[in-house]
């Protein structure tokens, strides 16, 4: 039987959150893409559920934040309970969960399948991406003699479609492949990469329940450390559910027999850890168990043609709720780079930065998870959490929120030599949430909400006090230089920069008509663009670490700062951009 043959720009193997975020980028950038998934349908119960603030910023950039927050459960408070050696269970602490500094969201919870559905619905609005279920990848061959040809399709994949009568096979030729196929990644095995790390004897159960309980903090994010008995961690979920993590075995105990784990055992252990309070299970929607292991793939890319993202790269426990977030951020880092290369806008060498930027994040994820498991094990032996561990847990909060990532690959990040506060505008870190007021309308925005994920680079000009003639002249000179950079460096297919200006003058002291055209342009169809000039709301310069003289900040399509310089430093900005857009010379 002759196999059907086809060609595609990008083949994504796996339609979980990591694969779908990669597909979202391809959809936004118009890249012909197929997503294949062996499951017959999206995940309906169970799976990951934690959403950290950085993921919400990503969702907003794609335009799906409101759909997420309409159905999620925000984490509004935390409680810590401990049982001492005498068997007494008491609350040690209870606190509200504040929104992180310079961010619009705190963390929240939503079942993975619902997140997948929301992303899929937005992808389906774009014709360039197709998602196929019940499709299995059977073989992968990389034609190495075609790697240096930009328009070649060197990745040859055999797909088996199990949804057709009797099954059928197809030969797909792809320019690039993304393996988002989970911890047992088929793609990783085809590439010959190995998972390096350790498997522990720590065993946990996880279950989603509808319960009735007299426990006072049942609707908070609650940790219970029970002396000599194990730990319990639970969180309020959507639709009246509660997600419970139940410790069945510590890492320092003898091997726990996995075959003995049942739904009844989990509920019995849960009820025992809550005593003297009662808990009645009205419905069990899902349960599972896992032995904790920490593994990291020894490779993430092959020839910069096949890429691994998410659990295909890093394995850990689901206890701290970071896995889905880090997995999506892997794809958020890769997607714009891959789309830009395919559109012949970006230098193909940019693809090498995926592994150099994301491997340190994966390693940090595993260390963070290892620490939290150690924290649980120690607390259940002693009945309390040691002070040094609590201090370190506090220090890890930026990592837990997704804000500790600091990229340092020199192709995309020009490091600053000046001392900066941790939440300032720093090359390599995500651009923070800073509130400004639209000059024309007075409407308040967070600058970050203006940085949409469409594959464009963003230029943010902190202009200073434009009521001063010298500052206005510097600003307009900068605007003219930016227009020249657009014409000389940016590929025509990319269009223009997303330009945002933030000044410190009174609104009545300047008129938009006095500004360079790039800050107040005219479109033949939509007319004047009033959405480029904003006023500082008294503190945004200080919060950003920007001085009175202002600055120019170049933000990548994924909202990370690439370069920061003085308003007059056209040469510095040009020097940053040229290696990235070098492909224009060959387009």
From Swiss-Prot:
Classification via InterPro entries: FAD-bd (IPR002938), FAD/NAD-bd_sf (IPR036188), Phe_hydrox_C_dim_dom (IPR012941), PHOX_C_sf (IPR038220), RIFMO-like (IPR050641), Thioredoxin-like_sf (IPR036249)
Transmembrane parts of this sequence: 7-27
EC number(s) on file: 1.14.13.-
Pfam families: FAD_binding_3, Phe_hydrox_dim
Membrane topology type: Single-pass membrane protein
Superkingdom of the source species: Eukaryota
Catalysed transformations (reactions): cyclo(L-arginyl-L-dehydrotyrosyl) + AH2 + O2 = cyclo(L-arginyl-(Z)-dehydro-3,4-dihydroxytyrosyl) + A + H2O
Gene Ontology terms: cellular component: membrane
GO molecular function: FAD binding; oxidoreductase activity, acting on paired donors, with incorporation or reduction of molecular oxygen, NAD(P)H as one donor, and incorporation of one atom of oxygen
Keyword annotations of the record: FAD, Flavoprotein, Membrane, Oxidoreductase, Transmembrane, Transmembrane helix
Annotated compartments: Membrane
Binding annotation for FAD: 245, 311
Associated pathway: Secondary metabolite biosynthesis
Family: Belongs to the PheA/TfdB FAD monooxygenase family.
Subunit structure: Homodimer.
The protein's role, per its UniProt record: FAD-dependent monooxygenase; part of the ank cluster that mediates the biosynthesis of NK13650 C, a highly modified cyclo-arginine-tyrosine dipeptide. AnkC uses as substrate the dehydro-cyclodipeptide intermediate generated by the monooxygase ankB and acts as a hydroxylase that installs the m-OH through a canonical flavin-dependent aromatic hydroxylation mechanism. Within the pathway, the cyclodipeptide synthase ankA acts as the scaffold-generating enzyme and is responsible for formation of the cyclo-Arg-Tyr diketopiperazine (cRY) from L-Arg and L-Tyr.
Protein name per Swiss-Prot or TrEMBL: FAD-dependent monooxygenase ankC
Organism: Aspergillus thermomutatus
Taxonomic lineage from the root: Eukaryota, Fungi, Dikarya, Ascomycota, Pezizomycotina
